[in-house]
């Protein structure tokens, strides 16, 4: 506005009549640019908070860019680099050739404890694919009848593998492409293609599914193309199994995560997970042993669940007010890798359920149900140092930044706030949604249009499903009752009679409730027999946003 003052003075000196329109135009531009709209315009009314898992990979990238710039403006990122290196997809070349020269083959790793989270997911994915391939080969060998036919199948498989080996791309990573973050979700899925109304949009969709961006615009430095599909959740098997068992059997266990446990049974479970076995936690397991196993997984993990380069940024949120702390934690969660944020959400969900049962309550049968005595503060004391580990980046930041309070106390405060507000941390507020949409539109308007149309189809399908569920929950009256209701309304009653016409129960309604007092009543036969409750219509939980 300061640069417009000389122009307004010159315009006033030349022509005083144009001053009022210029002032109105300047005020309108100021409202649109600074406040985000004209007076009375509130875009938040039609926009709701959406889950971070409903965003596509492209939207997740723009969300990270938005969170990065927001945190930089608040001076929360000191050592975090936008172009930080990703985990290497290929193994060490020297180690690889050394094993080849020695005639040894690298065994498939099944380890789960004591390694990084990315390596845990890689091992699980590789083990699952190996089991599927082994089962397929066994089925093929079992279906062969004659020896010649089996010999032909073996020769065909060998030549097929040789052909695929020489025809593959040389720059293909060693890890499965479906797992690596660089090659994940490279095209539109079959479900997305099935949602298209006509085949004319097929080519456009395939082109939009592989949008490329300059390296300078990529927050995480990935060179591969982004997808318009959401990212699948990536949670280790041991975390999911332990959380499910605790939610089923441990909500009423007093002092969970703090009482003594059997070291031998925990070591046995740990060895089973490290061997790649399909471990099933049944009712015979002790809940304290499972809780200790979950705690050991995060404590012995090679990296920190909350990234090391964001260590000091998380601790700085402990010095803020509760509302400001929650907003800063949201932005920091957006910057986390998807596998870390998914695992953190699963853990916080289980811990929050434990805190909901910390106090004594009365059961359905009227008996007193003792609480587990584990509040969010007690759980934060247990998991504070396990989730926030100080690595080399954290040590460097701690020397540069003076926090003012002890790091352990700050970590407990941060973890407690995350447990209490776990459901809000992984939601995207409306004003962040608009910024993400603007960034997507600047990079590719066609991609934003495709995302809008897909979200609109999701809303329509959710409404149809809601109406079907409402019809199933509110069954239609039998034909005899409906016919009796119509006859009762159409039959004239005697003027001197004080008796009301016989109407089956459930058909008569108060006119003051629907038509309003003083208005003529609507005949019952004109009303539809099938009605969808309005309160159920607002519980779809599906939303989309516009810039």
Swiss-Prot record:
UniProt note on tissues of expression: Detected in the outer root sheath of hair follicles at the level of the stem cell bulge, during the anagen and telogen phases of hair growth (at protein level).
Domain Rho-GAP, first and last residues per copy: 226-426
KW Chaperone (keyword) present: no
Family annotation (Pfam families): RhoGAP
InterPro entries linked: ARHGAP6_RhoGAP, Rho_GTPase_activation_prot, RHOGAP6/36, RhoGAP_dom
Oligomer and partners: May interacts (via the Rho-GAP domain) with the active form of RAC1.
Protein name: Rho GTPase-activating protein 36
Native organism: Homo sapiens (Human)
């Amino acid at each position: 506005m300061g640069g417009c003052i000389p122009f307004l003075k010159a315009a006033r000196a030349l022509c005083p009549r144009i001053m009022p329109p210029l002032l109105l135009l300047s005020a309108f531009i100021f409202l649109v640019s600074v406040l985000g709209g004209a007076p009375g315009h509130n875009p938040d009314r039609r926009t709701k908070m959406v889950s971070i898992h409903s965003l596509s990979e492209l939207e997740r990238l723009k969300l990270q860019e938005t969170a990065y710039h927001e945190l930089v403006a608040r001076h929360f990122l000191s050592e975090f680099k936008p172009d930080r290196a990703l985990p290497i997809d290929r193994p060490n070349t020297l180690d690889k050739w050394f094993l080849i020269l020695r005639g040894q083959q690298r065994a498939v790793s099944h380890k789960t404890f004591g390694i990084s989270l990315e390596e845990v997911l890689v091992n699980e994915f590789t083990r699952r694919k190996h089991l599927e391939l082994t089962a397929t080969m066994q089925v093929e060998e079992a279906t062969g009848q004659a020896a010649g036919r089996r010999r032909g199948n073996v020769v065909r498989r060998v030549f097929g593998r040789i052909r695929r080996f020489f025809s593959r791309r040389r720059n293909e990573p060693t890890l499965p492409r479906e797992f690596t973050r660089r090659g994940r979700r490279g095209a539109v899925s079959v479900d997305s293609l099935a949602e298209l109304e006509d085949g004319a949009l097929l080519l456009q969709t395939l082109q939009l599914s592989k949008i490329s961006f300059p390296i300078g615009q990529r927050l995480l430095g990935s060179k591969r193309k982004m997808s318009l599909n959401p990212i699948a959740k990536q949670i280790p098997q041991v975390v999911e199994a332990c959380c499910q068992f605790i939610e089923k059997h441990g909500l009423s266990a007093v002092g969970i995560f703090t009482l003594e446990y059997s070291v031998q049974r925990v070591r046995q479970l740990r060895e089973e997970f490290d061997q790649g076995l399909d471990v099933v936690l049944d009712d015979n397991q002790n809940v304290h042993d499972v809780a200790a196993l979950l705690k050991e997984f995060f404590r012995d993990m090679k990296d920190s669940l909350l990234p090391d380069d964001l260590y000091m940024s998380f601790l700085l949120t402990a010095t803020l007010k509760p509302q400001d702390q929650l907003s800063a934690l949201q932005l920091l969660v957006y910057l986390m890798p998807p596998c870390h944020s998914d695992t953190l959400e699963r853990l916080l969900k289980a811990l929050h359920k434990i805190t909901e049962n910390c106090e004594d309550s009365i059961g359905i049968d009227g008996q007193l149900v003792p609480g587990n005595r584990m509040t969010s503060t007690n759980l934060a004391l247990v998991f504070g140092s396990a989730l926030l580990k100080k690595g080399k980046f954290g040590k460097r930041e701690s020397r540069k930044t003076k926090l003012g309070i002890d790091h352990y106390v700050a970590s407990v405060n941060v973890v407690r706030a995350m447990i209490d507000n776990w459901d809000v941390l992984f939601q995207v507020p409306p004003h962040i949604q608009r910024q993400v949409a603007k960034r997507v539109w600047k990079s590719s308007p066609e991609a934003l249009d495709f995302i809008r149309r897909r979200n609109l189809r999701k809303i329509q399908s959710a409404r149809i499903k809601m109406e079907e569920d409402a019809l199933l929950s509110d069954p239609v009256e039998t034909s005899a009752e409906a016919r009796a209701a119509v006859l009762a309304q159409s039959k004239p009653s005697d003027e001197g009679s004080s008796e009301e016409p016989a109407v089956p129960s459930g058909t008569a309604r108060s006119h003051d409730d629907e038509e309003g007092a003083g208005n003529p009543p609507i005949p019952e036969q004109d009303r539809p027999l099938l009605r969808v409750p309005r309160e159920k219509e607002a519980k779809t939980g599906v939303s989309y946003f516009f810039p």
